[in-house]
Amino acid sequence: AIMNAMGSDYIREVNVVKSARVGYSKMLLGVYAYFIEHKQRNTLIWLPTDGDAENFMKTHVEPTIRDIPSLLALAPWYGKKHRDNTLTMKRFTNGRGFWCLGGKAAKNYREKSVDVAGYDELAAFDEDIEQEGSPTFLGDKRIEGSVWPKSIRGSTPKVRGTCQIERAASESPLFMRFH
C-alpha cells in the first residue's frame, strides 16, 4: 500500500512516518526506478547532508542501477567515468535524470525542474535552510511545473513538536496507519 501511494499519479504528497530499518530507502529507490524507466519522469532526492547524498549514491543508487536490468539498459555509462554518471546526477538514455543532493545548502534546491521530489530522513534536515524556508517548501518548488508532481517524504521521527516529518504528516488530509 505504501509503494502504491508513492507510485500513484493521483496522490501528490506522501509522508511516511516510520520506525528505523523498515526499508523506506529501498522502497523509495524502487519507486524512483519505476518513475525513471516506466513513467519516464525526472526525479530528485535530498538527504540531510552532501556527505549523506554522496554515500547514498554510492551504496544504494549505483547497486540499484546495476541490479535492475531495465535500468541498467538505460545506463550504458554504468561503471565508467562519464558526464552522465556523477555522484550527484545520473542521466539515462531515455533522457530522464536522477539527482541526489544534500539538503543543507539552499543552492541545492535551485535550478532543477523535476517531476518527483523525495526526502530521506526528513527529521534530520535543518528546519530552515539558510533563512530561505523549510526543505519541503524549497524542494517542492522544483515540482511546480510538472504535469504529474509528486513529493515523497519519509523519516523516523525525532523530538515531538519540532520534527519535520511529524509536522508534514499532521498537515496531510489523510492518515493511514499500518500495523
Regions found by a protein language model. Give the residues of each.
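Phosphate/NTP-binding elements of NTP-utilizing enzymes
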Residues: A1-H179
